[in-house]
Amino acid sequence: MHDNMSTMVYMKEEKLEKLTQDEIISKTKQVIQGLEALKNEHNSILQSLLETLKCLKKDDESNLVEEKSSMIRKSLEMLELGLSEAQVMMALSNHLNAVESEKQKLRAQVRRLCQENQWLRDELANTQQKLQKSEQSVAQLEEEKKHLEFMNQLKKYDDDISPSEDKDSDSSKEPLDDLFPNDEDDPGQGIQQQHSSAAAAAQQGGYEIPARLRTLHNLVIQYASQGRYEVAVPLCKQALEDLEKTSGHDHPDVATMLNILALVYRDQNKYKDAANLLNDALAIREKTLGRDHPAVAATLNNLAVLYGKRGKYKEAEPLCKRALEIREKVLGKDHPDVAKQLNNLALLCQNQGKYEEVEYYYQRALEIYQTKLGPDDPNVAKTKNNLASCYLKQGKFKQAETLYKEILTRAHEREFGSVDDENKPIWMHAEEREECKGKQKDGSSFGEYGGWYKACKVDSPTVTTTLKNLGALYRRQGKFEAAETLEEAALRSRKQGLDNVHKQRVAEVLNDPENVEKRRSRESLNVDVVKYESGPDGGEEVSMSVEWNGMRKMKLGLVK
Protein backbone atom coordinates (compact mmCIF):
# COMPACT_ATOMS: atom_id res chain seq x y z
CA MET A 1 0.00 0.00 0.00
CA HIS A 2 2.89 2.26 0.78
CA ASP A 3 4.27 1.64 -2.72
CA ASN A 4 0.93 2.54 -4.26
CA MET A 5 0.80 5.83 -2.38
CA SER A 6 4.36 6.71 -3.48
CA THR A 7 3.43 5.99 -7.07
CA MET A 8 0.37 8.25 -6.83
CA VAL A 9 2.43 11.11 -5.28
CA TYR A 10 5.05 10.76 -8.04
CA MET A 11 2.38 10.88 -10.72
CA LYS A 12 0.88 14.00 -9.17
CA GLU A 13 4.33 15.67 -9.01
CA GLU A 14 4.94 14.71 -12.65
CA LYS A 15 1.65 16.31 -13.65
CA LEU A 16 2.54 19.46 -11.70
CA GLU A 17 5.87 19.66 -13.51
CA LYS A 18 4.09 19.63 -16.85
CA LEU A 19 1.79 22.53 -15.93
CA THR A 20 2.46 25.87 -17.64
CA GLN A 21 2.79 29.13 -15.78
CA ASP A 22 -0.68 30.23 -16.85
CA GLU A 23 -2.14 26.94 -15.66
CA ILE A 24 -0.39 27.27 -12.30
CA ILE A 25 -1.79 30.79 -11.85
CA SER A 26 -5.26 29.61 -12.79
CA LYS A 27 -5.09 26.68 -10.35
CA THR A 28 -3.80 28.95 -7.61
CA LYS A 29 -6.72 31.33 -8.10
CA GLN A 30 -9.14 28.38 -7.83
CA VAL A 31 -7.43 27.22 -4.63
CA ILE A 32 -7.70 30.73 -3.17
CA GLN A 33 -11.41 30.81 -3.98
CA GLY A 34 -11.90 27.38 -2.39
CA LEU A 35 -9.95 28.32 0.71
CA GLU A 36 -11.94 31.57 1.02
CA ALA A 37 -15.20 29.64 0.84
CA LEU A 38 -13.97 27.04 3.32
CA LYS A 39 -12.79 29.79 5.67
CA ASN A 40 -16.19 31.47 5.56
CA GLU A 41 -17.87 28.16 6.23
CA HIS A 42 -15.63 27.46 9.23
CA ASN A 43 -16.32 30.95 10.60
CA SER A 44 -20.06 30.29 10.40
CA ILE A 45 -19.72 26.95 12.18
CA LEU A 46 -17.52 28.52 14.85
CA GLN A 47 -20.05 31.28 15.47
CA SER A 48 -22.83 28.69 15.73
CA LEU A 49 -20.88 26.58 18.23
CA LEU A 50 -20.07 29.60 20.35
CA GLU A 51 -23.74 30.57 20.53
CA THR A 52 -24.68 26.98 21.42
CA LEU A 53 -22.03 26.90 24.09
CA LYS A 54 -23.57 29.96 25.74
CA CYS A 55 -26.90 28.19 26.08
CA LEU A 56 -25.51 24.94 27.48
CA LYS A 57 -24.56 24.31 31.04
CA LYS A 58 -21.23 22.92 31.95
CA ASP A 59 -21.55 19.22 31.44
CA ASP A 60 -20.25 16.62 29.11
CA GLU A 61 -22.10 18.05 26.16
CA SER A 62 -20.57 21.50 26.64
CA ASN A 63 -17.12 19.99 26.74
CA LEU A 64 -17.76 18.39 23.38
CA VAL A 65 -18.78 21.71 21.85
CA GLU A 66 -15.64 23.41 23.17
CA GLU A 67 -13.51 20.65 21.70
CA LYS A 68 -15.18 21.13 18.30
CA SER A 69 -14.66 24.88 18.53
CA SER A 70 -10.97 24.38 19.22
CA MET A 71 -10.59 22.14 16.18
CA ILE A 72 -12.38 24.62 13.95
CA ARG A 73 -10.03 27.45 15.12
CA LYS A 74 -7.03 25.32 14.19
CA SER A 75 -8.56 24.66 10.81
CA LEU A 76 -9.12 28.42 10.32
CA GLU A 77 -5.46 29.11 11.13
CA MET A 78 -4.38 26.55 8.57
CA LEU A 79 -6.78 28.04 6.01
CA GLU A 80 -5.39 31.54 6.60
CA LEU A 81 -1.84 30.20 6.21
CA GLY A 82 -2.81 28.55 2.94
CA LEU A 83 -4.41 31.77 1.71
CA SER A 84 -1.26 33.74 2.60
CA GLU A 85 0.94 31.28 0.70
CA ALA A 86 -1.38 31.40 -2.32
CA GLN A 87 -1.28 35.22 -2.34
CA VAL A 88 2.54 35.11 -2.13
CA MET A 89 2.56 32.82 -5.13
CA MET A 90 0.34 35.25 -7.06
CA ALA A 91 2.60 38.19 -6.17
CA LEU A 92 5.65 36.17 -7.21
CA SER A 93 3.95 35.31 -10.48
CA ASN A 94 3.23 38.99 -11.19
CA HIS A 95 6.85 39.85 -10.43
CA LEU A 96 8.09 37.13 -12.77
CA ASN A 97 5.79 38.45 -15.48
CA ALA A 98 7.22 41.97 -15.03
CA VAL A 99 10.77 40.61 -15.16
CA GLU A 100 9.97 38.68 -18.31
CA SER A 101 8.47 41.75 -19.92
CA GLU A 102 11.57 43.81 -19.09
CA LYS A 103 13.74 41.03 -20.45
CA GLN A 104 11.84 41.09 -23.74
CA LYS A 105 12.30 44.86 -23.97
CA LEU A 106 16.03 44.52 -23.38
CA ARG A 107 16.25 41.82 -26.02
CA ALA A 108 14.46 44.10 -28.48
CA GLN A 109 16.93 46.88 -27.68
CA VAL A 110 19.84 44.51 -28.18
CA ARG A 111 18.49 43.46 -31.58
CA ARG A 112 18.03 47.10 -32.59
CA LEU A 113 21.54 48.03 -31.45
CA CYS A 114 22.96 45.07 -33.33
CA GLN A 115 21.18 46.24 -36.48
CA GLU A 116 22.48 49.80 -36.01
CA ASN A 117 25.97 48.50 -35.40
CA GLN A 118 25.83 46.47 -38.59
CA TRP A 119 24.60 49.53 -40.53
CA LEU A 120 27.44 51.63 -39.14
CA ARG A 121 29.93 48.94 -40.11
CA ASP A 122 28.52 48.92 -43.65
CA GLU A 123 28.71 52.73 -43.84
CA LEU A 124 32.29 52.68 -42.58
CA ALA A 125 33.22 50.08 -45.18
CA ASN A 126 31.61 52.18 -47.95
CA THR A 127 33.38 55.31 -46.73
CA GLN A 128 36.71 53.50 -46.67
CA GLN A 129 36.12 52.31 -50.23
CA LYS A 130 35.29 55.85 -51.35
CA LEU A 131 38.39 57.20 -49.60
CA GLN A 132 40.53 54.60 -51.31
CA LYS A 133 39.06 55.51 -54.70
CA SER A 134 39.61 59.22 -53.98
CA GLU A 135 43.23 58.59 -53.08
CA GLN A 136 43.68 56.65 -56.29
CA SER A 137 42.10 59.52 -58.25
CA VAL A 138 44.40 62.03 -56.55
CA ALA A 139 47.40 59.92 -57.47
CA GLN A 140 46.27 59.78 -61.10
CA LEU A 141 45.67 63.54 -61.15
CA GLU A 142 49.13 64.15 -59.74
CA GLU A 143 50.56 62.08 -62.57
CA GLU A 144 48.66 64.17 -65.13
CA LYS A 145 49.23 67.50 -63.42
CA LYS A 146 52.35 68.54 -65.28
CA HIS A 147 50.83 67.66 -68.62
CA LEU A 148 47.71 69.68 -67.81
CA GLU A 149 49.88 72.59 -66.68
CA PHE A 150 51.63 72.45 -70.02
CA MET A 151 48.31 72.56 -71.87
CA ASN A 152 47.31 75.55 -69.78
CA GLN A 153 50.62 77.25 -70.49
CA LEU A 154 49.91 77.05 -74.21
CA LYS A 155 46.82 79.17 -73.64
CA LYS A 156 48.59 81.80 -71.62
CA TYR A 157 52.12 81.72 -72.99
CA ASP A 158 52.00 85.48 -73.52
CA ASP A 159 51.08 86.09 -69.88
CA ASP A 160 53.32 88.84 -68.51
CA ILE A 161 53.32 88.74 -64.70
CA SER A 162 54.22 91.85 -62.77
CA PRO A 163 55.58 91.09 -59.26
CA SER A 164 53.50 93.94 -57.84
CA GLU A 165 50.30 92.47 -59.24
CA ASP A 166 50.04 89.24 -57.30
CA LYS A 167 46.32 88.98 -57.78
CA ASP A 168 46.66 88.82 -61.58
CA SER A 169 49.67 86.51 -61.53
CA ASP A 170 47.78 83.49 -62.83
CA SER A 171 45.56 85.20 -65.36
CA SER A 172 46.30 85.13 -69.08
CA LYS A 173 47.25 88.54 -70.43
CA GLU A 174 48.15 89.97 -73.80
CA PRO A 175 51.04 92.31 -72.91
CA LEU A 176 50.01 95.26 -75.04
CA ASP A 177 51.30 97.90 -72.67
CA ASP A 178 54.53 96.10 -71.85
CA LEU A 179 56.29 98.25 -74.43
CA PHE A 180 54.99 101.48 -72.97
CA PRO A 181 55.73 103.44 -69.79
CA ASN A 182 55.33 101.39 -66.65
CA ASP A 183 51.82 101.52 -65.20
CA GLU A 184 53.20 101.13 -61.69
CA ASP A 185 55.13 104.42 -61.67
CA ASP A 186 54.26 106.94 -59.02
CA PRO A 187 51.17 108.80 -60.18
CA GLY A 188 52.57 111.89 -58.59
CA GLN A 189 55.23 112.12 -61.26
CA GLY A 190 52.64 112.84 -63.88
CA ILE A 191 51.17 115.57 -61.68
CA GLN A 192 54.54 117.21 -61.17
CA GLN A 193 55.15 117.38 -64.91
CA GLN A 194 51.89 119.08 -65.78
CA HIS A 195 53.24 122.61 -65.83
CA SER A 196 56.15 121.85 -68.14
CA SER A 197 53.99 119.79 -70.49
CA ALA A 198 51.34 122.48 -70.51
CA ALA A 199 53.96 125.03 -71.49
CA ALA A 200 55.13 122.79 -74.32
CA ALA A 201 51.55 122.41 -75.46
CA ALA A 202 51.12 126.15 -75.49
CA GLN A 203 54.16 126.53 -77.71
CA GLN A 204 53.17 123.81 -80.17
CA GLY A 205 49.41 124.23 -80.14
CA GLY A 206 49.34 128.00 -80.31
CA TYR A 207 47.22 128.44 -77.19
CA GLU A 208 47.87 128.77 -73.47
CA ILE A 209 46.12 126.68 -70.82
CA PRO A 210 44.87 128.98 -68.02
CA ALA A 211 46.41 128.54 -64.58
CA ARG A 212 42.98 127.77 -63.08
CA LEU A 213 42.49 124.95 -65.59
CA ARG A 214 45.90 123.52 -64.77
CA THR A 215 44.99 123.56 -61.07
CA LEU A 216 41.68 121.81 -61.72
CA HIS A 217 43.47 119.35 -63.95
CA ASN A 218 45.91 118.42 -61.18
CA LEU A 219 43.12 118.17 -58.60
CA VAL A 220 41.12 115.81 -60.81
CA ILE A 221 44.21 113.66 -61.33
CA GLN A 222 44.80 113.53 -57.58
CA TYR A 223 41.21 112.62 -56.69
CA ALA A 224 40.96 110.04 -59.47
CA SER A 225 44.20 108.38 -58.39
CA GLN A 226 42.67 108.07 -54.90
CA GLY A 227 39.48 106.57 -56.29
CA ARG A 228 37.41 109.57 -55.18
CA TYR A 229 35.33 109.80 -58.33
CA GLU A 230 32.45 111.46 -56.51
CA VAL A 231 34.75 114.48 -56.18
CA ALA A 232 36.66 114.22 -59.46
CA VAL A 233 33.59 114.05 -61.72
CA PRO A 234 31.82 117.19 -60.36
CA LEU A 235 35.12 119.09 -60.60
CA CYS A 236 35.46 118.16 -64.27
CA LYS A 237 31.86 119.06 -65.02
CA GLN A 238 32.16 122.41 -63.25
CA ALA A 239 35.36 123.17 -65.16
CA LEU A 240 33.68 122.23 -68.44
CA GLU A 241 30.74 124.48 -67.69
CA ASP A 242 32.99 127.44 -66.84
CA LEU A 243 35.18 126.91 -69.91
CA GLU A 244 32.22 126.72 -72.26
CA LYS A 245 30.83 129.95 -70.79
CA THR A 246 34.10 131.85 -71.18
CA SER A 247 35.67 130.29 -74.30
CA GLY A 248 32.84 128.51 -76.07
CA HIS A 249 32.44 124.81 -76.76
CA ASP A 250 34.92 124.60 -79.65
CA HIS A 251 38.05 125.43 -77.70
CA PRO A 252 41.19 123.30 -77.05
CA ASP A 253 40.77 123.75 -73.28
CA VAL A 254 37.30 122.23 -73.49
CA ALA A 255 38.72 119.28 -75.43
CA THR A 256 41.39 118.84 -72.77
CA MET A 257 38.82 118.70 -69.97
CA LEU A 258 36.55 116.41 -72.02
CA ASN A 259 39.47 114.02 -72.43
CA ILE A 260 40.16 114.03 -68.69
CA LEU A 261 36.50 113.41 -67.83
CA ALA A 262 36.36 110.60 -70.40
CA LEU A 263 39.27 108.83 -68.73
CA VAL A 264 37.59 109.18 -65.32
CA TYR A 265 34.43 107.62 -66.78
CA ARG A 266 36.54 104.87 -68.33
CA ASP A 267 37.89 103.99 -64.89
CA GLN A 268 34.29 103.77 -63.64
CA ASN A 269 33.45 101.36 -66.51
CA LYS A 270 31.13 103.93 -68.07
CA TYR A 271 32.42 103.16 -71.55
CA LYS A 272 29.56 104.60 -73.52
CA ASP A 273 29.79 107.99 -71.79
CA ALA A 274 33.58 107.96 -72.15
CA ALA A 275 33.34 107.23 -75.89
CA ASN A 276 30.90 110.10 -76.41
CA LEU A 277 33.22 112.53 -74.62
CA LEU A 278 36.29 111.35 -76.55
CA ASN A 279 34.48 111.73 -79.87
CA ASP A 280 33.49 115.26 -78.87
CA ALA A 281 37.08 116.06 -77.84
CA LEU A 282 38.36 114.61 -81.13
CA ALA A 283 36.04 116.81 -83.17
CA ILE A 284 37.09 119.93 -81.23
CA ARG A 285 40.81 119.21 -81.58
CA GLU A 286 40.52 118.48 -85.29
CA LYS A 287 38.65 121.74 -85.77
CA THR A 288 40.89 123.94 -83.63
CA LEU A 289 44.33 122.31 -83.89
CA GLY A 290 44.16 120.59 -87.25
CA ARG A 291 43.74 116.95 -88.26
CA ASP A 292 47.47 116.20 -88.02
CA HIS A 293 48.14 117.63 -84.57
CA PRO A 294 49.79 115.32 -81.96
CA ALA A 295 46.88 115.98 -79.59
CA VAL A 296 44.54 114.55 -82.24
CA ALA A 297 46.70 111.42 -82.40
CA ALA A 298 46.55 111.13 -78.60
CA THR A 299 42.75 111.37 -78.62
CA LEU A 300 42.51 108.83 -81.46
CA ASN A 301 44.66 106.44 -79.48
CA ASN A 302 42.56 106.91 -76.33
CA LEU A 303 39.43 106.19 -78.34
CA ALA A 304 41.02 103.10 -79.91
CA VAL A 305 41.95 101.81 -76.45
CA LEU A 306 38.38 102.32 -75.28
CA TYR A 307 36.99 100.38 -78.25
CA GLY A 308 39.53 97.64 -77.64
CA LYS A 309 38.46 97.40 -74.02
CA ARG A 310 34.91 96.80 -75.22
CA GLY A 311 36.08 94.14 -77.70
CA LYS A 312 35.39 96.31 -80.76
CA TYR A 313 38.67 95.56 -82.48
CA LYS A 314 37.50 96.36 -86.01
CA GLU A 315 36.33 99.83 -84.94
CA ALA A 316 39.55 100.41 -83.00
CA GLU A 317 41.93 99.43 -85.82
CA PRO A 318 41.28 102.39 -88.21
CA LEU A 319 41.57 104.83 -85.30
CA CYS A 320 44.89 103.32 -84.30
CA LYS A 321 46.13 103.41 -87.90
CA ARG A 322 45.23 107.07 -88.24
CA ALA A 323 47.04 107.87 -84.98
CA LEU A 324 50.06 106.02 -86.40
CA GLU A 325 49.96 108.07 -89.60
CA ILE A 326 49.87 111.33 -87.64
CA ARG A 327 52.79 110.33 -85.42
CA GLU A 328 54.83 109.21 -88.44
CA LYS A 329 54.12 112.50 -90.16
CA VAL A 330 54.91 114.69 -87.15
CA LEU A 331 57.65 112.69 -85.40
CA GLY A 332 59.14 110.67 -88.23
CA LYS A 333 58.80 106.97 -89.04
CA ASP A 334 61.64 105.89 -86.76
CA HIS A 335 60.54 107.65 -83.56
CA PRO A 336 60.09 105.50 -80.39
CA ASP A 337 56.52 106.80 -79.98
CA VAL A 338 55.77 105.45 -83.44
CA ALA A 339 57.00 102.05 -82.23
CA LYS A 340 54.60 102.26 -79.29
CA GLN A 341 51.73 102.95 -81.65
CA LEU A 342 52.85 100.03 -83.84
CA ASN A 343 52.59 97.73 -80.84
CA ASN A 344 49.04 98.88 -80.12
CA LEU A 345 48.12 98.27 -83.75
CA ALA A 346 49.82 94.87 -83.75
CA LEU A 347 47.79 93.64 -80.81
CA LEU A 348 44.53 94.88 -82.31
CA CYS A 349 45.35 92.90 -85.47
CA GLN A 350 46.38 89.87 -83.43
CA ASN A 351 42.98 89.76 -81.77
CA GLN A 352 41.46 89.66 -85.25
CA GLY A 353 43.77 86.87 -86.45
CA LYS A 354 45.70 89.07 -88.91
CA TYR A 355 49.03 87.47 -88.11
CA GLU A 356 50.93 88.65 -91.18
CA GLU A 357 50.19 92.26 -90.28
CA VAL A 358 51.03 91.52 -86.65
CA GLU A 359 54.46 90.21 -87.63
CA TYR A 360 55.10 93.26 -89.80
CA TYR A 361 54.16 95.75 -87.09
CA TYR A 362 56.15 94.00 -84.37
CA GLN A 363 59.22 93.62 -86.58
CA ARG A 364 59.07 97.27 -87.52
CA ALA A 365 58.67 98.34 -83.88
CA LEU A 366 61.57 96.07 -82.91
CA GLU A 367 63.78 97.65 -85.55
CA ILE A 368 62.94 101.16 -84.28
CA TYR A 369 63.70 100.28 -80.67
CA GLN A 370 66.98 98.57 -81.50
CA THR A 371 68.10 101.48 -83.68
CA LYS A 372 66.99 104.38 -81.48
CA LEU A 373 67.16 102.97 -77.95
CA GLY A 374 69.76 100.23 -78.29
CA PRO A 375 69.58 96.43 -77.91
CA ASP A 376 69.51 96.62 -74.10
CA ASP A 377 66.38 98.77 -73.86
CA PRO A 378 63.54 96.93 -72.04
CA ASN A 379 61.20 97.65 -74.94
CA VAL A 380 63.37 95.48 -77.20
CA ALA A 381 62.88 92.40 -75.01
CA LYS A 382 59.18 93.11 -74.62
CA THR A 383 58.69 93.47 -78.36
CA LYS A 384 60.57 90.24 -79.00
CA ASN A 385 58.37 88.51 -76.46
CA ASN A 386 55.23 89.82 -78.17
CA LEU A 387 56.53 88.73 -81.57
CA ALA A 388 57.32 85.28 -80.18
CA SER A 389 53.74 85.06 -78.87
CA CYS A 390 52.52 85.81 -82.38
CA TYR A 391 54.72 83.03 -83.74
CA LEU A 392 53.32 80.60 -81.19
CA LYS A 393 49.76 81.40 -82.22
CA GLN A 394 50.69 80.44 -85.79
CA GLY A 395 52.56 77.28 -84.79
CA LYS A 396 55.96 78.74 -85.69
CA PHE A 397 57.61 77.21 -82.66
CA LYS A 398 61.19 77.35 -83.96
CA GLN A 399 61.05 81.11 -84.58
CA ALA A 400 59.46 81.66 -81.17
CA GLU A 401 62.11 79.53 -79.47
CA THR A 402 64.88 81.55 -81.13
CA LEU A 403 63.42 84.84 -79.87
CA TYR A 404 62.97 83.52 -76.34
CA LYS A 405 66.59 82.36 -76.26
CA GLU A 406 67.77 85.76 -77.54
CA ILE A 407 65.90 87.51 -74.71
CA LEU A 408 67.37 85.25 -72.02
CA THR A 409 70.87 85.39 -73.51
CA ARG A 410 70.84 89.20 -73.63
CA ALA A 411 69.54 89.40 -70.06
CA HIS A 412 72.36 87.12 -68.94
CA GLU A 413 75.00 89.14 -70.79
CA ARG A 414 73.82 92.40 -69.23
CA GLU A 415 74.42 91.00 -65.75
CA PHE A 416 77.39 88.64 -66.18
CA GLY A 417 79.14 89.46 -69.41
CA SER A 418 79.68 87.53 -72.61
CA VAL A 419 78.56 83.93 -72.91
CA ASP A 420 81.27 81.25 -72.89
CA ASP A 421 81.77 77.71 -71.63
CA GLU A 422 81.95 78.92 -68.03
CA ASN A 423 79.25 81.58 -68.29
CA LYS A 424 76.10 80.17 -69.86
CA PRO A 425 72.53 81.51 -69.83
CA ILE A 426 69.77 79.56 -68.17
CA TRP A 427 68.37 77.96 -71.32
CA MET A 428 71.73 76.34 -72.11
CA HIS A 429 71.88 74.81 -68.64
CA ALA A 430 68.30 73.61 -69.05
CA GLU A 431 69.12 71.84 -72.30
CA GLU A 432 72.25 70.32 -70.76
CA ARG A 433 70.18 68.93 -67.91
CA GLU A 434 67.77 67.50 -70.47
CA GLU A 435 70.63 65.77 -72.30
CA CYS A 436 72.11 64.38 -69.08
CA LYS A 437 68.89 63.29 -67.38
CA GLY A 438 69.38 59.66 -68.42
CA LYS A 439 72.99 59.56 -67.29
CA GLN A 440 72.71 61.21 -63.90
CA LYS A 441 69.92 62.51 -61.70
CA ASP A 442 70.95 64.94 -59.06
CA GLY A 443 69.07 67.36 -56.90
CA SER A 444 71.41 70.22 -57.72
CA SER A 445 70.12 73.64 -56.89
CA PHE A 446 69.96 76.35 -59.47
CA GLY A 447 73.04 77.89 -57.92
CA GLU A 448 75.15 75.51 -60.03
CA TYR A 449 73.57 76.70 -63.26
CA GLY A 450 74.56 80.34 -63.18
CA GLY A 451 73.78 83.03 -60.67
CA TRP A 452 71.49 85.55 -62.32
CA TYR A 453 68.25 83.68 -61.72
CA LYS A 454 69.31 82.56 -58.24
CA ALA A 455 70.19 86.12 -57.24
CA CYS A 456 67.09 87.32 -59.09
CA LYS A 457 68.95 90.30 -60.47
CA VAL A 458 67.17 89.90 -63.79
CA ASP A 459 63.65 89.89 -62.39
CA SER A 460 61.74 91.87 -64.99
CA PRO A 461 58.24 90.64 -65.89
CA THR A 462 59.40 90.12 -69.48
CA VAL A 463 62.19 87.73 -68.45
CA THR A 464 59.85 85.87 -66.10
CA THR A 465 57.29 85.48 -68.87
CA THR A 466 59.98 84.38 -71.31
CA LEU A 467 61.11 81.67 -68.88
CA LYS A 468 57.56 80.38 -68.58
CA ASN A 469 56.87 80.50 -72.31
CA LEU A 470 60.09 78.75 -73.27
CA GLY A 471 59.40 76.17 -70.56
CA ALA A 472 55.96 75.53 -72.07
CA LEU A 473 57.59 75.17 -75.47
CA TYR A 474 60.05 72.63 -74.08
CA ARG A 475 57.17 70.64 -72.64
CA ARG A 476 55.51 70.58 -76.04
CA GLN A 477 58.75 69.12 -77.42
CA GLY A 478 58.90 66.52 -74.62
CA LYS A 479 61.87 68.17 -72.90
CA PHE A 480 60.41 67.94 -69.42
CA GLU A 481 63.69 68.28 -67.50
CA ALA A 482 64.55 71.48 -69.36
CA ALA A 483 61.01 72.78 -68.83
CA GLU A 484 61.18 72.18 -65.08
CA THR A 485 64.51 74.04 -64.92
CA LEU A 486 63.05 77.16 -66.53
CA GLU A 487 59.79 77.00 -64.59
CA GLU A 488 61.62 76.81 -61.26
CA ALA A 489 63.83 79.73 -62.27
CA ALA A 490 60.70 81.75 -63.16
CA LEU A 491 59.13 80.86 -59.83
CA ARG A 492 62.20 81.98 -57.90
CA SER A 493 62.43 85.21 -59.87
CA ARG A 494 58.77 85.99 -59.21
CA LYS A 495 59.11 85.15 -55.51
CA GLN A 496 62.09 87.50 -55.20
CA GLY A 497 60.09 90.23 -56.90
CA LEU A 498 57.17 89.73 -54.50
CA ASP A 499 59.54 89.88 -51.52
CA ASN A 500 60.85 93.21 -52.76
CA VAL A 501 57.30 94.52 -53.13
CA HIS A 502 56.43 93.44 -49.57
CA LYS A 503 59.53 95.20 -48.22
CA GLN A 504 58.61 98.34 -50.13
CA ARG A 505 55.07 98.25 -48.73
CA VAL A 506 56.39 97.87 -45.18
CA ALA A 507 58.59 100.90 -45.72
CA GLU A 508 55.63 102.85 -47.07
CA VAL A 509 53.54 101.94 -44.03
CA LEU A 510 56.28 103.12 -41.70
CA ASN A 511 56.67 106.39 -43.60
CA ASP A 512 53.01 107.22 -44.23
CA PRO A 513 50.61 104.57 -42.88
CA GLU A 514 47.50 106.65 -43.53
CA ASN A 515 48.01 107.04 -47.28
CA VAL A 516 49.08 103.41 -47.67
CA GLU A 517 45.96 102.22 -45.86
CA LYS A 518 43.79 104.26 -48.21
CA ARG A 519 45.52 102.79 -51.21
CA ARG A 520 45.19 99.25 -49.83
CA SER A 521 41.44 99.77 -49.35
CA ARG A 522 41.14 100.88 -52.97
CA GLU A 523 43.14 97.89 -54.16
CA SER A 524 40.87 95.57 -52.17
CA LEU A 525 37.96 96.93 -54.17
CA ASN A 526 39.84 96.21 -57.43
CA VAL A 527 39.81 99.88 -58.42
CA ASP A 528 42.52 100.63 -60.98
CA VAL A 529 44.67 103.66 -60.25
CA VAL A 530 44.28 106.27 -62.95
CA LYS A 531 47.58 107.67 -64.16
CA TYR A 532 47.26 110.71 -66.40
CA GLU A 533 50.20 111.72 -68.48
CA SER A 534 50.63 114.82 -70.61
CA GLY A 535 52.82 114.51 -73.66
CA PRO A 536 54.70 117.36 -75.22
CA ASP A 537 51.76 117.85 -77.53
CA GLY A 538 49.42 118.56 -74.63
CA GLY A 539 47.33 115.42 -75.17
CA GLU A 540 46.19 113.72 -71.99
CA GLU A 541 46.74 110.00 -72.06
CA VAL A 542 46.39 107.19 -69.57
CA SER A 543 47.86 103.74 -69.09
CA MET A 544 44.95 101.42 -68.55
CA SER A 545 44.22 97.73 -68.08
CA VAL A 546 41.99 96.36 -70.79
CA GLU A 547 39.92 93.15 -70.77
CA TRP A 548 40.13 91.34 -74.09
CA ASN A 549 37.70 88.52 -75.04
CA GLY A 550 36.54 88.24 -71.44
CA MET A 551 39.53 86.04 -70.53
CA ARG A 552 42.73 87.83 -71.47
CA LYS A 553 43.70 90.89 -69.57
CA MET A 554 45.93 93.23 -71.54
CA LYS A 555 47.44 96.57 -70.86
CA LEU A 556 46.76 99.12 -73.52
CA GLY A 557 49.30 101.87 -73.16
CA LEU A 558 48.24 105.20 -74.49
CA VAL A 559 51.20 106.47 -76.43
CA LYS A 560 52.07 110.07 -77.01
Curated annotation (Swiss-Prot):
UniProt modified residues of type Phosphotyrosine: Y449
Coiled coil start-end: 27-156
Modified residues (Phosphoserine): S162, S460, S521, S524
GO biological process, one term: intracellular protein transport
SUPFAM superfamilies attached to this UniProt entry: TPR-like
TPR repeat segments: 213-246, 255-288, 297-330, 339-372, 381-414, 464-497
Biased composition (Low complexity): 188-203
Primary residence: other
Cited Gene3D superfamilies: Tetratricopeptide repeat domain
Entry GO terms, CC: axon; ciliary rootlet; cytoplasm; cytoplasmic vesicle; cytosol; growth cone; kinesin complex; membrane
PTM characteristics: Phosphorylation at Ser-460 by ERK inhibits interaction with CLSTN1 and localization to cytoplasmic vesicles.
UniProt keyword Kinase, yes or no: no
Keywords of this entry: Calcium, Cell adhesion, Cell projection, Coiled coil, Cytoplasm, Cytoplasmic vesicle, Cytoskeleton, Microtubule, Motor protein, Phosphoprotein, Repeat, TPR repeat
Tissues with expression: Expressed in brain (at protein level).
Bias (Basic and acidic residues): 156-176
GO MF annotation terms: kinesin binding; tubulin binding
Disordered: annotated span: 156-203
Superkingdom of source: Eukaryota
PANTHER family: KINESIN LIGHT CHAIN (PTHR45783), KINESIN LIGHT CHAIN 1 (PTHR45783:SF7)
Binding partners and assembly: Oligomeric complex composed of two heavy chains and two light chains. Interacts with SPAG9. Interacts with ATCAY; may link mitochondria to KLC1 and regulate mitochondria localization into neuron projections. Interacts (via TPR repeats) with TOR1A; the interaction associates TOR1A with the kinesin oligomeric complex. Interacts with BORCS5. Interacts with MAPK8IP3/JIP3 and NTRK2/TRKB; interaction with NTRK2/TRKB is mediated by MAPK8IP3/JIP3. Interacts with CLSTN1; phosphorylation at Ser-460 inhibits interaction with CLSTN1.
Function: Kinesin is a microtubule-associated force-producing protein that may play a role in organelle transport. The light chain may function in coupling of cargo to the heavy chain or in the modulation of its ATPase activity.
Family of this protein: Belongs to the kinesin light chain family.
The protein's name in its UniProt record: Kinesin light chain 1
Gene symbol of the encoding locus: Klc1
